[in-house]
A protein has these predicted regions:
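Short, flexible helix-loop junctions that flank or precede catalytic/ligand sites
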Residues: 1-309
Length: 309
C-alpha cells in the first residue's frame, strides 16, 4: 500500500504541473492546489508519516457558491463597501475563512472597477475579471513569500489586497501600512473572537513596539469577522459568526490596552450591525438548526448563553 500511495502522490505532483516534489521530499510537508480542466479544482496537503508519504485532498468548486446558501449574512457582505483600511476574517483551521474571503472578493469584483491583488498559499477559488481586474498570485509559484509579494503589490497599483494569512510581524506591519495608505486590505488569522485577534496581532511585536502598533491598528482596522463551523441537526456544518465593526469606543479600547472590554461592546451593539458569537449560536438554536448542547459547546460564554436557551 505505501508504494501505491507514493505513486499516486507523485502523479498528483505531475497533475499540478509547476509544483516540484523535491522540496516536499526534503521538508516533509506541502500545501498546494491544482485543477483538472472540465472536472474540478483540488486543494492538497501532502506530508510524511511513519517514513512514507500521505495526502489529504479536498475538492474546490470552480464556481463560488451563493453566499446566502453558505449562511453568510448580508451584514458581512456589506463590508465590501469599505474602500480602505483592514478587514480581518478569523477562525480555526477549516472554519471556512477562505470561502468567506473569496465571497467578499467576488462581491467587490462584481460591483466595483478596482484592481484586486490576491496573495494566497495556495490559490483556491479562481476569480474571473468582472467589473474589476483580479490578479491572483500563489506563494512559492508566482512569488517567494507573503512579505515579498505584499511589498511588490504596493507597487502594482492595487485598490484591494487580499493577504491569505499574516504570519509574522513584518508582514503584519506592511499590511497595516498598506491599509494606512489608502488600500483595502483583507486577511485572515487563526483566532476566535475580535478581542483575541487584536491581542494576537499586538503580541506578535516586541513590548517596546506594542503601544505604537496598537495606535496604528486602532486607526486602520475597520472590522473583524470571526467564524466557526458547527454541526447542524441534519448532519451538515453551518457557520456561526461574530462581527465587530470599528467604533470610536473600540478604537479607544485598543489604544488604551483594554481589548478585554471589546466583547461587552459587541454584545450591546446589535444596532450597529455587530453580532456576538453567542447571539449567532442562539439564533441557530432558535431556528432549529443546532441543538442546545452544540450551542453551549461552541459558546464563548456558556453560562450566560444557558440562561437564554
Amino acid at each position: 500500500m505505501p508504494d501505491t500511495t507514493e505513486s499516486l502522490i507523485r502523479q498528483i505532483y505531475v497533475l499540478a504541473q509547476n509544483r516540484k516534489i523535491e522540496p516536499f521530499l526534503e521538508s516533509g510537508d506541502d500545501d498546494f492546489s491544482f485543477a483538472i480542466r472540465g472536472l474540478s479544482r483540488y486543494r492538497v496537503s501532502t506530508y510524511k508519516q511513519r517514513g512514507s508519504l500521505a495526502a489529504v485532498i479536498r475538492v474546490i468548486a470552480f464556481e463560488l457558491p451563493d453566499p446566502a446558501l453558505l449562511g453568510i449574512p448580508d451584514s458581512i457582505l456589506q463590508l465590501t463597501d469599505l474602500t480602505k483600511g483592514m478587514l480581518l476574517v478569523t477562525g480555526p483551521a477549516g472554519s471556512g475563512k477562505s470561502t468567506t474571503l473569496a465571497c467578499l472578493i467576488d462581491r467587490i469584483n462584481s460591483t466595483r472597477e478596482d484592481h484586486i491583488i490576491t496573495l494566497e498559499d495556495p490559490l483556491e477559488f479562481l476569480h474571473r475579471h468582472k467589473k474589476s481586474i483580479v490578479s491572483q498570485r500563489e506563494i512559492a509559484t508566482d512569488t517567494d513569500n507573503y512579505l515579498t509579494a505584499l511589498r511588490a503589490a504596493l507597487r502594482q497599483s492595487p485598490d484591494v489586497i487580499l493577504l491569505g494569512e499574516m504570519r509574522d510581524h513584518e508582514t503584519i506591519q506592511t499590511a497595516m501600512t498598506a491599509a494606512e495608505t489608502g488600500h483595502l486590505v483583507l486577511s485572515s488569522l487563526h483566532t476566535i473572537g475580535a478581542a483575541n485577534t487584536i491581542s494576537r496581532i499586538i503580541d506578535v511585536f516586541e513590548p517596546s513596539q506594542q503601544h505604537q502598533i496598537a495606535m496604528q491598528l486602532s486607526m486602520v482596522l475597520r472590522a473583524v469577522v470571526s467564524q466557526q463551523l458547527v454541526p447542524a441537526i441534519d448532519g451538515h456544518m453551518v457557520p456561526a459568526f461574530e462581527i465587530m465593526i470599528m467604533t470610536p469606543a473600540i478604537s479607544n479600547m485598543i489604544r488604551d490596552n483594554k481589548t478585554h472590554q471589546i466583547d461587552g461592546i459587541i454584545y450591546t451593539s446589535a444596532k450597529d450591525e455587530m453580532r456576538s458569537m453567542d447571539s449567532s449560536l442562539l439564533q441557530l438554536y432558535q431556528s432549529g438548526t443546532i441543538t442546545a448542547e452544540t450551542a453551549l459547546h461552541y459558546s464563548t460564554n456558556p453560562d450566560m448563553l444557558r440562561k437564554k436557551l
